[in-house]
């Protein structure tokens, strides 16, 4: 369909002899020739495979096949495309991606309200605090950024300028966003802020000291939020004068790419504060997911067992590239070893130690946290002490160059390899060892009412960890695979590797 005004304009130009002469069609003819299509299609498949493997996402390859076969013949291509679409729309990938779309719309619906505020103060200009401040300033908020030293603030402003150059289209947009991002060494911005976000290191005593000082300056109607990734809000709120206006806003790294933010509640929070927090996240184009205060909340509670199991395999001599390749073959955007480097080994250590202390089985078996976590490996502590923290320092479990992990590709499988079947079994077990503890932790969070329902779990894990979207989320994956099959696999792993794989009691509610 063509808008009417364009038709009138074309007629007027034709009458006035202003229409441009059509260019020669020989480049188009050459482009659509069979040899050219074959060469270009091969290149398209190669480039697409780097982002979307054909076994997981068949649609882009079907489109390339159509163009290679019918390019230049519009009628034949259209007819073939209808048949191709009809075939693809009923695949599990298509059905699950449609589900993911509606999960996202559901989360967006939580942020529909209008946030009345316009001023934000961020305490802590490190990787998370600085990037939260930069993202909010880009979305039109006036943001003051404080820290105890000027160097982190300067570094955050520099990172913001680099980010704005990547996502901005106009120099005026970049200039205005930088103008809205205000260095604030003394913390004066706290007094006028509608929302104060604390993004300090994961130390309970430090955070509580920050709150005590901030509350003395904050407006009575302002909201205080913590970006803690693991500490329970019941501990953090001790000593607060207005605990009803205290919440968790757990962003994920990198802030500019990760859409999910966990909105963490506790039993004394004002419901209006939660509503305002959701609206704030809508203002900055982020997806809120409501979670109840508990160690690790949802995403880290589920992610830590996945990463710890990878560390155990690493200790057993499995190459890190092989571990990551197994996770990526399942559909994860990156493997757990690379993810640990991406997040930062210091953050991994802090969260793992905290969760290991908090998630202890009780003597009577009735404690809400029943699954033991593996011990934190000594080498992880040693790397953190040496400052080998991953991507941000250029070295962690991988060497990093130009923002990418330097990997040795795993050896390619040979078709005539007599041990090929055994290797496939090993790969399947390796994948289950990483993925199923993550799924089991999601079941535990559902049983413990950390989250309200399965849809919240699946949406949060897809948008917070990148859990294979074409699988529809961890709990949807478990239902598709078959809950009895998952339970049998967990029991088999528990018999072979230990109690950490014993299925959570919450599986009975799903079954």
Task: Give residue ranges: language-model regions.
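N-terminal glycine-rich phosphate-binding loop for ADP-containing cofactors
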Residues: 1-511
């Amino acid at each position: 369909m063509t808008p009417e005004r364009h038709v009138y304009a074309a007629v007027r130009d034709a009458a006035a002899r202003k229409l441009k002469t059509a260019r020669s069609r020989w480049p188009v003819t050459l482009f659509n020739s069979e040899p050219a299509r074959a060469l270009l299609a091969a290149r398209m498949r190669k480039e697409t495979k780097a982002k979307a493997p054909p076994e997981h996402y068949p649609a882009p390859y079907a489109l390339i096949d159509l163009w290679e076969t019918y390019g230049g013949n519009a009628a034949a291509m259209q007819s073939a495309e209808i048949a191709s679409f009809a075939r693809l729309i009923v695949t599990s990938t298509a059905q699950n991606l449609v589900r993911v779309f509606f999960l996202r719309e559901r989360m967006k619906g939580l942020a529909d309200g209008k946030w009345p505020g316009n001023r934000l103060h961020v305490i802590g200009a490190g990787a998370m605090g600085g990037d939260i401040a930069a993202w909010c300033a880009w979305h039109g908020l006036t943001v003051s950024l404080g820290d105890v030293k000027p160097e982190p603030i300067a570094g955050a402003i520099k990172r913001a300028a680099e980010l704005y150059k990547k996502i901005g289209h106009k120099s005026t947009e970049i200039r205005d966003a930088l103008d809205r991002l205000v260095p604030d060494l003394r913390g004066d911005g706290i007094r006028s802020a509608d929302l104060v976000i604390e993004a300090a290191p994961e130390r309970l005593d430090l955070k509580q000291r920050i709150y005590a000082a901030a509350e003395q300056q904050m407006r009575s109607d302002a909201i205080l939020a913590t970006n803690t990734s693991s500490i329970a809000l019941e501990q953090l709120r001790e000593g607060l004068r207005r605990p009803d206006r205290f919440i968790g806003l757990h962003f994920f790294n990198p802030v500019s790419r990760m859409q999910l933010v966990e909105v963490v509640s506790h039993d004394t929070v004002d419901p209006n504060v939660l509503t305002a927090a959701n609206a704030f996240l809508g203002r900055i184009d982020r997806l809120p997911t409501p979670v109840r205060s508990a160690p690790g909340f949802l995403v880290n509670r589920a992610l830590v067992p996945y990463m710890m199991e990878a560390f155990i395999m690493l200790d057993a001599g499995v190459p890190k590239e092989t571990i990551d390749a197994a996770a990526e073959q399942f559909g994860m955007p990156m493997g757990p070893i690379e993810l640990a480097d991406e997040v930062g080994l210091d953050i991994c250590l802090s969260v793992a130690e905290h969760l290991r202390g908090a998630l202890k089985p009780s003597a009577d078996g009735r404690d809400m946290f029943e699954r033991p976590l593996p011990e934190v490996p000594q080498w992880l502590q040693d790397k953190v002490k040496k400052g080998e923290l991953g991507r941000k320092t250029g070295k962690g479990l991988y060497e990093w160059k130009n923002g990418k992990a330097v990997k040795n590709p795993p050896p390619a499988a040979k078709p005539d390899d007599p041990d090929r079947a055994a290797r496939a079994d090993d790969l399947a077990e390796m994948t289950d060892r990483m993925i199923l503890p993550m799924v089991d932790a999601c079941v535990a969070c559902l049983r413990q009412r950390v989250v309200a329902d399965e849809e919240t779990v699946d949406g949060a894990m897809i948008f917070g960890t990148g859990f294979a979207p074409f699988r529809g989320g961890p709990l949807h994956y478990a239902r598709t695979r078959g809950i009895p099959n998952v339970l049998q696999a967990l029991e088999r792993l528990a018999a072979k590797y230990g109690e950490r794989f014993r299925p959570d009691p919450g599986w009975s509610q799903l079954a």
